[in-house]
Amino acid sequence: MHSTTNNSNKRNNEEKHKQPEANGSADNGEGASGTRNQTAGDTTPEAGTRNETEAGAGARGQTDGASRSGTNAKVATASSARQMDMEKAAETTSTIENVNDVGIMQQKKPPTVIQSRTDVFNEQFANEALHPTTKVIFNGLDVNTEVQPLSDDFEQISDPKGYLTYSVKYEDQFAKKDKLRASEADDRIVGPTVNLFKYGSAVVNIDLNQDFFDTTTGINLTKGILLVQDLLVPIGVTAGAEQSSEYVSGLLMVLFKVMTDNRLVIVGETTTPISNTLSTVVNNILRTTYHNNVGINPALLRDFTHVNWLNQDITNMLQQAGTRFGLGLTATRLDYVRLVKTIVGYALDIDHFAASVLNINLRALMEANVTADDRIKALQAHSMISTQFHGPNQGALRPELAFDHDHVIRCLMLAAANYPRLEGIIVQINTGYVASTNVIRPVSEKRYFPENLEQNQSAARLVSAVKARASEADISSIHLAIAREVSPMFNVHELKKIAESFEDPSSIVVVLEFILFSLFFPTEFNRIKGDIQNVLLLFFSRWYPVEYGIFIQRGATYTINAAGEFEFSGRNEKWDQSSYLSEHFPALFSDVPLAGANTIIAIMRLFTPQGFLRTDDLAIAANFPRASRNPQTYIPYTNQRGTVTNEFASRFRTIVATLANVVNERAVQDDMQKATRSCTKQWLRHLETQFDNIAVAHTDHLSVVYATMSNFMLNFTNNFSGNHATFKPEQYVITSPEGSYKPIMERQGETVDGLTIIDTSIVWPILCQCTYPLVRQSGKGVDAVSIMEEIVYPDPGTTLSQSLSVAQILSKLTLPDAFINMILSGGDSVAMRTYQTEANDELDEGIRMTTYDQYLSHIRERLHITNVPDPIYITGASTPDQIAASVQATHVAVVLYQNGVINGPASTYLRENEVLVVMPDYSNVAARFVYANAQMNNNRYHESVLEIADIFDQADFIQTDNAVRRLRALMPTLSTSQIRHAIERIAQITNVDSTDYGKLTLRFLGTLTRPLKMQNAQIRRIRPDGTVLRYDDQIDIEAFRWSRYFLDELQLRRLAVGLRLIANPRIARRFNGVRIMYLTDDDPDPDFVPAIPEGYVAVQYAHRLFSSSLANKRNRVTYTHPPTGMAYPSPTGRPHVHLTINERAGMSKLVADNIIASVIKSNWVVDILDIEYTAEVMTPSEGYTQHVDAESIMTAPKGKLFHLQFMDGLLRPEPSAFDPPASGEDIRLIYPLQPISVARSMRAIVNHNEVDRPRGAVAPSSYEMDTGTLSRNGDLLYSPVENGQAGIPKLEVDHISFSNVVSMMTSNIRTGDDMAVERVNPSDIRAINIRNA
C-alpha cells in the first residue's frame, strides 16, 4: 500500500509494511487473522488444558495494541518520553489462571506493530528526531494511537520521467568531433542536449519514453510505432489484421499506464547557480534554483550548436513573443500558519502530458481538504462506542486524498462479484478484532452438567447426547462465529451435517442447540434456517407426527405475494440452501398460526430474535462505503444498564420452561420413567443458571463489540432485519447489456468449513466452557471470587489500517476490469439528425431524430440494463405533459413516433427540451410535424452523433467520449473470453502484490471468476426470482445510479490526459490513403505528394469498369472509359486517368494487377482511400528493411493495417568521381496522401557549405521550447503572444511541449506519516448506551 520513496517520509515505513503481514495472516478461513501478534484472544494448541489460555488471560493486563479503560489509556506521551524508559514501556504484563490456584504470574509479551509505531513516535519526539514542524504540532499532546493515511496510494519520486523523449538517427559520414563550445559550468546544463542533437543528426523524432513504459507493458517501439502482441487477440478475422490488433493494444497499454500513473514529485537535488561561472545565455534561462537533472530541450542548443542555421532559428524563436523558456523555481506556496514551504513549482524539461498528470496528482492530494476531524471520524468508527479522540489539524502538512465513498463501494461490489472469497478476508479482520477485545475466552473447567446430576441410564443417555454435540472449546471458532454475525455474506451458507434420529428424549439437545444459536447469532441463524428446518421437521415427525402431518399439508415452503400475503406451497419438500436467495421461505419460520399444530408453533416462537436494528451512525459520519440508503446492523441483544432483570436471561428461562414441558409431555405420552423427566429438567435448570451467569457479558459487553464492528469500513451490507418470516438479503448483480449478470452473492459459492459451513454446536462451549471479564467481575466465574479485570479497548488503528489496505488492494484488482469497461462502454453514441425548424437556426438547433435501427442497437440495450419502461409512443394527440411524464419515468429524454402529425405544443416541447424522437426512417419527416412557429425549412438538417452518456444524464464524461469512440473504432470485435484475456494481461502491470498484505490478500482471494462481459457494466438489484430491477433512487444508493465505469475522479482525469496523448498525431502515426504513381525518385522526400498532372480524367472506381473480354486470342481484363464508353483491353495506350478507389472490397487480383500495369504503362494515377497504415521514415544508412508492393495494398482484406516505410534521402551522401555509375533510375510507386513525418522534431542537423541551411532542413517547433505557465486551476498554458492575453492550454492543441512547470512537494509535507492522536476510552463499558450512541 505504501509506495513512498521520499527519505524524509520513511518514519515507521518498515513497521507499516510489516503490520499487515503480522496482523493479516489467513488460516483457511478459521479466524486466525490478526490473532498471533496483535490480539489477546489467540490461544495455543493446549487451550483448554488450563483454567484459562495464556494469550486469553494475558489480555487482562494489556492486549497487544490495546489499552485499558479511562485515563489509563494514555500509554505514552510526547512530553513524558524524555524521562521514561522506552524498553520498559514496551513491556506488557499478563496473567495466567491456574487450575488449582487462582494465582498471578508475570509474563512478558512483545509489543504489537501498532504499539511499536506509537512508541517509535514518542521516542523520536524525545530524541529530537521528528521533523521540527511535526514536533511543534504535537508538543504537549498525549499520543497513544496512530493511524495510517486514509488514502496513501502515491509513489513519491524526485526525478520524474516523462512519457515522451527524443530519439535521433545519425548519418555518420556527416559527424564532426568539434569540442563543445561551453564552460564546465555550462556543460552541466547544456551538455546532455548538445551531445544528443549532435552534428550529423539526420532526423530527430518524438517517441514514447521506453524508460517509463517499461518492459512489463510489452510495448515494442522497434518500428517507430507502439505495438503490443498479447493484449487483444483477434479471432475469426481475416488474415493480416494482427498488426491492427497489436497497434490498438499498444494504444490501450499506453493509456492504462498513464491512467495509473500515481507519481508525486518531491523536491530532489537542486542547485543555486553561480552567475559568474555561467554564460549569459545560460544565466538568462536559470531561476534562483534549478533541478539537478536538467533534461533535454532544443532550446539549450542556443549558442552551443555548431549548426549555424539551427542556432539562428532557435535564437529567433526564443526571442519572439509567445515563447519563453526557463529552468528552475517558478513559484512557492507557504503554509501561512506555520510559515513553512509546502509546494514549489519547477520548470523542467519534460513533456506536457507527463507534467499534466504529475500536477493533477498533487493537486488532487492538496485540494482534498481532509481534516483531522475526518481522520478521527474514521478512527471512531473502528473504536468502541463512546471513545473520544483529540488530535491536531496538520492541514497542508499532512494531506490525504479524500475518501471516495461512492468509488470504494462500487469497487467492493465488483470485487465481491469477481472474488466470492472476499467474504473470508472481511471476516478475518472482524475475527482479529473480536479476539483483541478479550470479550470471551475458554477455560478448562467444563460446566455442561450439574455437579449432582443423577446417575442412571437416562442421565447417561443425556450426557452422551450432550457430549456428542459439545466439542472442546476452540477460541478461534468462537471468535469467528461472533465476527460472522456482522460481516457481509457473498456465499450462501450451509448447516454442518447433523446425524440425529430423534428417537430418544435426550435428542432435545439438538433442538436446544438450534434455539441457543438463534439467540447468540440470529443473523447467521437466518442464513441457515432452511437447513435447520430440515432437521426440525425430522424432530417434529418423530415427536409430534399428527401436528407434523397438519404442517406438511399446508406446505414446507411459502412465498410472499405483492400484497404481502403468505402463499404456502402445499408440498412436502426438503429445503435446498440454493433457495435461500430465491423467493421461497422455509415455512417453519412463517409465524403464521396453524390450527392443530400448537406445540410446533410454541417451539418455533422460541426462535424469535430479541435484538434490534442499529444505524451505522459512525460509519455514516466517517463517509464509509455502505450499500444501503439506510445502513443498519442487527445487534443480537442490547445492554441492560438500569434494568432490574436481564431480558436476555429471562428469555432463556422461558425457553427452559417450554422445553421442560415438551419433554414432560413426550415422557407422559410414551410412558417414560420419571427419572428421564427428572434428569432432563435438572440439566435444563443447570443451563439456566449458567445462562444467568453469562447473560450480562453478552448484553453489556459483547453487544458493544457488535455495535462497534457494525461501523467498520468493510462491513458495508445490512446483515438482517430481525424478522425470520420476511427477511431476504438485498441482492445486487453486475449487469451487462446483453442481459447476463454476475451476482454479488453466489447461490453455489465457496464452501469453507467454519466460514460458510456453519457448526451450531459452537453454542455449548460459549455457554459452558468460557469466561468473560464482566462475569469475573461479578464473582460468578471459575474463580468463585470477584476479580476486577480491566475491560480491553483495542487500538482502532489495526482494523482501520487493515480495512484501508484491503479497500485499496481491491481497487487495484478491479482497475483492469474498470479500464476495459470504460473502453468498451465510453463514447457510445447514436447517429442522429437535427431538423431545423426556424430559418435562422444554428446547426444544433431544432428537433432531434434518429431511427429505430439506431435506437434498438444503442439505446434500448441500456434501457434493458436498468429495466426502465419503454419511452412513450407519441401520436398526433400527444400532449407536452404526457411526453414530460414519460421522460421523468424513464429517466431518458427519448420518445417513439407511432403515427399522425405531431401537434404544435408537442413539437415545441420536443425542441425546447432536446428530446430525441425515434422515427421508423427519415423519409418525409416534415410531413409528420406541425411546428408552431414555422414549417421545417426544406428538410434542412444537420447530421451528428448524440452521446449515450448525455441521453442518460451522465454528461460529465462527454469530455472523453470522442477520443474513446475513435479508439473503439480501431478495435476488433471481441468475445467475452478475449475481453477476459485483455483484462488479465493488463492486470499483470497493476502491482497489486507489491506489499506483503497485497500478496496475502491475493493468495486468500483465490481464483478470479470473470464470466461477465465487462461492457456498460452497472450495479443493479435483482428480485429473488432473478429479474433485474432498474435503479430506484428511493432504495438504491446514489453510487449505484451509474457505475462511472468503476473509475474514480482522479483516474478519469488522468485518463483524459492519456486519451489526448494517444490521439496526438505525432504519437498515433496512423494514416489513411495512398497514391500509386510511377515516378523517378532520386531525392526521396517522405512527405512528398505528387500533384495530378493536367488533362487527367477523374474516374471513380466501380467493378463494372473492368471486365473480362477476348482479345488477340486471349482473355484480358478490359477497362471501359466512362467519358467515351470505349473499351481498352491492354494496359498500354489507355487515356490518362486519375482513378479513385473508395472501397477495395471485391477487387480481384487480376483487376489489381491490371490497374498497376496501367499506372506503369499508361501513367495512371491511382488513389486508394480505404487503406490504413502506420508510417516509418528511414534514413539512407538504414535503407528499407521491409517492402510492401502496390498489389498487396490493393488486394489486402479490410481491417489489415499496413506498415509502410518511406525514405528520407536528404542526407544521402554526395557521390564521388570514383563511385561506379548507377545502373538505373530510382523508381517509386507508393506515396502518402498527407505528410507522414509527424513525429519529426528536427531534420538534417548539418550545415550546407559549412554555413547555409540544407534544403528541407527542419528546426524544432517553438512549442517544444515554450515553458509557458501553470494556471491557477492547474492547466499548463503556452505563453501568450501578446501581453494581457491568456495562453492556450497545452492539452487542447496537437503541439508537444518539452518544457513545463511541475509542482513538487517540499520535505515539510508528510504524506506517508501516520496521524498520531490521543485516545480516551469509555470509563465504564456498562454505561454505554448502544441504542442511542
Swiss-Prot record:
Residues 1-10, 64-82 have a biased composition (Polar residues). It comes from the Viruses. Residues 1-93 are annotated as: Disordered. Pfam families: VP1-like_C, VP1_protrusion. One of its GO terms (cellular component) is T=2 icosahedral viral capsid. Its main location: virion. Transmembrane segments: none annotated. It is found in: Virion. The keyword Glycoprotein does not apply. Keywords: Capsid protein, Inner capsid protein, T=2 icosahedral capsid protein, Virion. Residues 11-20 have a biased composition (Basic and acidic residues). InterPro entries: VP1/VP3_C, VP1_protrusion. Inner capsid protein that self-assembles to form an icosahedral capsid with a T=2 symmetry, which consists of 120 copies of VP2, with channels at each of its five-fold vertices. This capsid constitutes the innermost concentric layer of the viral mature particle. Belongs to the turreted BTV-fold inner capsid family. Homodecamer; each decamer is made up of two conformers of VP2, called VP2A and VP2B. 12 homodecamers assemble to form an icosahedral capsid. This is Inner capsid protein VP1. It comes from Lymantria dispar cypovirus 1 (isolate Rao) (LdCPV-1).
